[in-house]
Amino acid sequence: DTEDGCISPGAVGYDINCLSSETNVRLPFGRRMPIADLRDRFEDERAVVAAEELTDSGIRLFTESGEREVFEVQTETGQTIRATADHPFSTPNGMTDLEGLAEGDTVFVHPFEGLSHEDPEEFTVLSERDFENENPQLVAFLKRNDLLPLQSTDEAFNRLLKLAGFHTGDGAFRGKQTWFYADPEDLSEIQDDIDALGFSPSKVYSRERTHEIDGNEFTRTEYSMKVSAHGLKQMLLRLGVPDGRKVESDFTLPEWFDRLTDWQRALYLSAFFGAEMSSPSTVSNTNFHCPKISQNRRRNVGDAGEAFMAGIAEALEGMGIRTNPIERFDAETDDTERLRLGIKSDAENLIRFFSRVGYRYNGEKRRKAAVAVQYLRRKEHVIENRARIASEVETLADGGTPVSDLTEQYDINDRFIERSAWNGRSGRPRPPSGFPTFEEYDEATELRENLTVPVEIESIREVGSEPVYDLGVEHDAHNFLANGFVVSNCGVRMVRTNLTYDDVQG
């Protein structure tokens, strides 16, 4: 099909290293999409690339091959991918074809998986009418930078969602200026988004601030950055960002929030969590506290604060993430209430939260979440394997297999086999006694600047033949994230021409 078809070198004899159709490719703004679904839209999309830092790149090539033999790789954390034997994976020794890898070898993965792409409902978020009382020069600037009218499908809107979420937590307005407070590396990321919108962010400022908590006084360096352009402030205000003292404000989530896709809601929430949610931390050697957000509101706007928390909980529920009931109680300050919302702390729920939503504009929390999610995945994978063995042992023992034979059959503690065979198990097994604590795992894990982590291959098995696909990216790193694995992109170089067949024949 010369109008709508895709380039398919595999169909004409090239040996293309490829991935199975359901392999999720990471896309910008926290999205993911099965590689086969990129066929008709790859030229309009960008793929996330694991360069020195994560970045995104245009996609220059999409390949589709006929059925080829594929193998399933599973890691010690339970992450899987299906690929042809010649597909290269990132390892400590560089890109290595799958056929050159074996159980126990190390590959690199990125723990964050994002949310499935959905095409947003298209509607006008802000129009020129919303600014009819503003200076005409301000309106002209916004129109010139394609910020008015602002549509729900605009890339600029995605950036504004992040800025609005973060500013609601750690921002302030001073006169016409918009201020953000964060660590320097996080302010740099905010500056990039502001610059992409056509505004000019300031340099990063620093000053020493003295604080007192529970009678203990300490000094810390506060970093900030401002945007003097009045247009950004007016846009953020109209997007629902509170003005003035937040404790006295009746702000809730924006009225259009429910019309957004999950991945768009996650942009706002993850930025707000980067500012306001507690960092991943453990309550015991292997179990985590529930990450939580807290707010103080004056009593007369406490209901608005509870509605804000309830909206967040509802949005997270739609992403498969469960929360604890909202807590609301008197704060120490007169006429002030404190509201608190936490993420349920069971391992599977935390994995979903850290890997689908997580934190934006906060590198330290993001780094901790990256290690935490891999630790929890490994822990859950070990527990699931132990539960499977316990079930098999109980069944075999009931069928008459001697326990001595079972202890020989399974590479696991004899006491575990005996208890499973004789007593059964009423609940899930615990991790084995030698399983590392999170602190030990954190210290031993080499987290790279792009937040990819090394993980061991647990198994590689042949799974049959199926159609396979690949991408070629424009970035010099020539890789992308597939089911979280850092894999090489298609190495074929192609030239497209407008010459017809008759032109070539002469």
Q: Where do the model's predicted regions map?
A:
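Basic, alpha-helical nucleic-acid-binding regions used in initiation and control of genome expression
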Residues: A370, Q374-R378, V382, S391, ...
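Major-groove recognition helix of helix-turn-helix-like DNA-binding domains
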Residues: I412-T437
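Long, charge-dense accessory insertions within large macromolecular proteins
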Residues: L19-R60, R415-I417, F438-T452
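Hydrophobic N-terminal alpha-helices or hydrophobic patches in metabolic proteins across all domains
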Residues: D1-C18, C490-G506
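Short, amphipathic alpha-helical "recognition" segments used to contact nucleic acids or chromatin
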Residues: V382-T401, E466, L471
